[in-house]
Amino acid sequence: MKIFLIDIDGTVCDDIKNEDSHLFSVAMPIENSREQINKWAQEGNIIFFFTAREEEHREVTKKWLEDHNFIHHGLIMGKPRCLNQEDEYVWIDNRKVRGITYNSIWGDLKEVEKKILTFGD
């Protein structure tokens, strides 16, 4: 089983910033995002959406996910925002973490070898 933490804006729908929150309810899903995420859920994986949207936008976000039939098990609001293209997230955990940078195409995951950051020996 995998636990997926999936961003919303720019990953499963149009890239809308908090400053344009009036557009959250009319965002369009990105092609194949729902199908792929729902497939993972139906395979027994856990789906959490992890978004930089603010807590005050929880209800409109939940409604959007429901209206567009995204299977999910939870919604985490308030992810720290990367304000520049050069910014990146670094997640440190005592469990295995796999990072996937969404690059505009949804589909099955494939295994590749990459150079990663790690602590010393």
Task: Set out the residue ranges of the language-model regions.
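HAD-like aspartate-dependent phosphatase fold
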Residues: 1-121
